[in-house]
């Protein structure tokens, strides 16, 4: 059948400057991606360049990809209560590397709450894909202005 490729919809006009960059993924141990994919679509539709790491993403993968690609936000997704603690590792690594002023950590997913976000020291909680995109745009615009 020849080469198979995935066509991506044109979410933002060509030549348009992106609002900023986000590193997105589902945390280590979690193979669920429907929610993450919805977040990616909403973010791309809002003019954000998204680096989608897929599922089962380690803290090191999140942070190194964010640094290499100059992402202002790391957005972590989790569907399972057994994997939500991995988000704490992402926050911890961002702080260990002294990146907390350049990279903000956003968390979301079915078992995640504002209370959990506060407990692990993440910067932002998004209750759904639309909220994640809106919050990311705000964060990135502030970063771009400073």
Question: How should each PLM-predicted stretch be described?
Answer:
Residues 125-126:
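A structural signal for hydrophobic residues in beta-strands of small regulatory alpha/beta folds
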Residues 11-27:
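Glycine/charge-rich, flexible interdomain linkers and switch-proximal surface loops
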Residues 36-46, 51-122, 131, 135-137:
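Cofactor-cradling patches in redox/metallo enzymes
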Residues 1-5:
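Short, small-residue-biased leader/transition segments that mark boundaries at the very start
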Residues 135-146:
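C-terminal helical cap(s) of enzyme catalytic domains, especially alpha/beta-barrels
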């Amino acid at each position: 059948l020849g080469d198979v490729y995935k066509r991506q919809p044109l979410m933002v006009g060509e030549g348009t400057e992106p609002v900023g960059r986000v590193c997105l993924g589902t945390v280590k141990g979690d193979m669920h991606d429907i929610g993450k994919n919805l977040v990616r679509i909403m973010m791309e539709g809002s003019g954000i360049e998204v680096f989608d790491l897929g599922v089962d993403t380690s803290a090191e993968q999140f942070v190194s990809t964010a640094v290499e690609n100059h992402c202002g936000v790391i957005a972590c997704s989790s569907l399972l209560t057994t994997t939500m603690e991995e988000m704490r590792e992402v926050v911890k690594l961002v702080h260990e590397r002294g990146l907390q002023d350049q990279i903000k950590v956003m968390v979301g997913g079915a078992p995640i709450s504002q209370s959990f976000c506060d407990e692990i020291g993440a910067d932002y909680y998004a209750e759904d894909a639309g909220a994640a995109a809106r919050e990311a745009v705000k964060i990135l615009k502030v970063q771009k202005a400073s």
